[in-house]
Structure formats: C-alpha cells, structure tokens
Amino acid sequence: MSTIFALCTPWGKSGVAVIRVSGQDAVKTFMHFKISNAIKPRVATFTPLYNAAHEVIDEVIVVYFSAPNSFTGEDVVELHTHGSIAVIRMILCELGKIFIPAGPGEFSLRAFLNNKVDLTRAEAIVDLINAETEMQAKQAIRQMSGSLEKLYQSWRQQLIDVLSNMEAYIDFPEEVTSSAVENISFLLDKIKESLENHLNDGRKGEILRQGIYVAILGEPNSGKSTLFNHLAKRDIAIVSEYAGTTRDVLETHIDIAGYPIVIIDTAGIRDSNDPVEQEGIRRAKLKAESADFKIIMLPYEKKDALNNEIIDLIDDRSICVLSKSDSIITQNLININNINFIPVSVCCNLGIEHLLSAIQKKVEADFKFCSTSPFITSERQRVHIQNAVNILKNISFELPMELISEDLRLSVRELEKVVGVISNEEILDNVFGKFCIGK
C-alpha cells in the first residue's frame, strides 16, 4: 500500500499541529527533511526540519512508531510542529512530493485492515471524535474498549459451536437422536432470544449518540419560545406578544448532566384557518409523537381552562410546566386536575433548575445504562443483527441437516459483518467515509 500523510489536528492557528505519515516508506520522512538526529521508536526527538535549500522550516518533535506497534499497524511518523498555517502548508507541500495525501478515515481503515481494530471499535472512534457531552463520550469509550466486539464474537462462537455439532451429525448420521436435535434447537433458541433482547433496546444507544429530543409544546403565547431561548442561552426563536409567531420547528443542542439534549420549539397548537400556521401545527404534533420527551406548557393565567387538545398530549414522557408563574412564590409542584405542574417564570428565572432537574431524571431513568452496558449504536449494526435473527427464526428442523447448517452459516456471516471478520467495499466506505481526514 502507498505511504500516506495528513494533518491530524484541526486546520488553523494553534499551539501545536500534528502531521501523521503511515506506510512502509514512512521513515523516508527523516531523509527528506534532512533529520540528522538518530530517531528511535517510541521516543520523542526534538529536531529541525529542512527543505531542499537546507532552510529551516520549523523545529519540531518527531515520534516514530515501528510496525506493527502503531495505530495503523504500519510504520508511522508523527511530526509535532508549531501550529502556524504557513509551517503546516510548507510541511504538507514537502510530504506531497514523496507520499500520497490520505483520504477521510484512511488511517483508521488501515488499522482495521491490519487487525488493530474491528468495525465496532472503528465506529466508536468517530463517535468519540463527534461526542459533545460526557455520556456520549463514555458510550464511545466503552465501545472502543471492545464491549460490543466481545458480545458479538461470543454469539458468533456459540453459533459456530452448534454448527460444528451439526457438521458432525451430517458426517455420522447414525449418531443423530431426537435428544441431540432437541439440544441443538434449545441452544439456537437461547442464542436467538439473546439477540432479540439486544435488538429490543428502544434504540437507546443510537438516540444517545445522536441526541435526546425534547419537544416544547403548548398553546400559542404559552412561553414556549421564551423558554427555548433561555435554555439555548441565546436568541434563536422570535418572541412576540402576538399569537402564532412561531410557525416552523426550531432546534438547539444543550448539555444536561452530560446528556446530549436537543430542545425543539414548536408552533402553538390551536384551531387556525391560516394554511401556514396549520402546517406549523401539523409539524408540532408530529414532533410530539416522535420526541423522546415532551415539555407541556400551560400559562398560569389559563390554569383554570385546560385545553383538551393539550391535555391529550400528556403521557409518561411528559413534563408539565405552569409558565409565566411570576407571582407564585412556591417552587413546589402545583396539582391541576390531577396533573402535577412545575411553576416556571423565565423572566424572573424561577423554576428553571427544577425543570432541568425533572428533565435529567426522565433522561437518566431511560439512558443511564448506555454508558455502562453495550448497546447498538448504529443502523449498520442493527441491520446485520436483525438479519441474523430472521435467519434463525426461519430454521425448520423438518429440513435436512445440510440445509439447516447452511442457514447457520448465513447467520454467522451476518454477525461477522458487524465486527468486520468479513466485509466488502460498500460496508467499509459506509464506516470509514464518516471520518475526517487525518484519522
């Protein structure tokens, strides 16, 4: 394979920039930059870099990782330079004379091809890079440690063990008894049940990775946009005394106790003849259905006239807020028609902490295990596991052992696709194409 190079740190001015070279000719970097110091593997060495005219480009730290003891499994040279745009450009220009620029995720792809990581760990790397909150990072780090790989390899090995027994029965049919068939059926049912339980996770790993959606819902002028802006800590939504100001769905990302929360502002729900407002209301109702949690807003002045359409939105995913509660001193829950409301006044900054705490409790009840237990984190993983389950479901012991064995092989292959024991170009492009250049 060609020797590749790329800037690993973000482009722009910084204290330090890191440029990585990987491949069988990576050590040619030393000769090209006229490095006279002896470079030892896994030792940081301070040295100047020279261009062809023997002019100093920069004084850098060089770290050399000899194959196979590197991230990619190849010889790797890292140049830790000053984060000057001019210096970075000059070094990349020099490297371009002897090596090939790396594509997105190409270093990680080589790590996979050299058995340094499986596909689930590779996906975890990009998830960690993209993590914006503590819980997202914890989930990615757990997956990077191999929790998913070990789980899937365990199921794969169990299927292979069953397959081995079946192959023996095919070779020695006189050994096949009713109890032997029952035992195989029992083992396959246990594996299938484990896989199905893994699938029936409410997509929590994927939701945590992408963000937990919380929709703010209520009548027009119930304070939805005001609360939305307050939680976002900036003016995103237009706030007006006129009802129906918000027509479209707005989103902002916030961090609550380490969880990635996507707060959604929606149009006020009411009867309207305005076609544009009607579309906004339709979208608000769709968000009410698809959101992970809901904040239901009721203005204090309307506490004695609850809107049935709003009440119908309240369920166990809801947090009810009595908005515009400027004159209320208590921070205790207020019960209205057997529904507990949190009194909140954004303008007086009252009840906000109580609301955030309520959101945190709802989220933790559903997602606290995502950072400690192996959950599915991508649609790619889910598809292959579902395929494996479907194959196992369709196995009939009325068929010849040879056909059952073939179905087992297909199920094993689906699990192998998850971790990358077998793969194709489309799968690899799907995984590594999401990486940035330099990783």
Swiss-Prot record:
Binding-site list for GTP: 221-226, 240-246, 265-268
One term of GO molecular function: GTPase activity
Residues reported to bind Mg(2+): 225, 246
EC numbers, comma separated: 3.6.-.-
CDD domains: trmE (cd04164), TrmE_N (cd14858)
Subcellular location: Cytoplasm
Cofactor: K(+)
Gene3D superfamilies noted in UniProt: P-loop containing nucleotide triphosphate hydrolases (3.40.50.300), Probable tRNA modification gtpase trme, domain 1 (3.30.1360.120), tRNA modification GTPase MnmE domain 2 (1.20.120.430)
Keywords: Cytoplasm, GTP-binding, Hydrolase, Magnesium, Metal-binding, Nucleotide-binding, Potassium, tRNA processing
InterPro entries on file: G_TrmE, GTP-bd, GTP-bd_TrmE_N, GTPase_MnmE, MnmE_dom2, MnmE_helical, P-loop_NTPase, Small_GTP-bd
GO biological process: tRNA methylation; tRNA wobble uridine modification
Cofactor note: Binds 1 potassium ion per subunit.
TrmE-type G domain sequence ranges: 211-364
Family designation: Belongs to the TRAFAC class TrmE-Era-EngA-EngB-Septin-like GTPase superfamily. TrmE GTPase family.
Subunit field text: Homodimer. Heterotetramer of two MnmE and two MnmG subunits.
NCBIfam families associated with the record: mnmE_trmE_thdF (TIGR00450), PRK05291.1-3 (NF003661), small_GTP (TIGR00231)
Official protein name in the record: tRNA modification GTPase MnmE
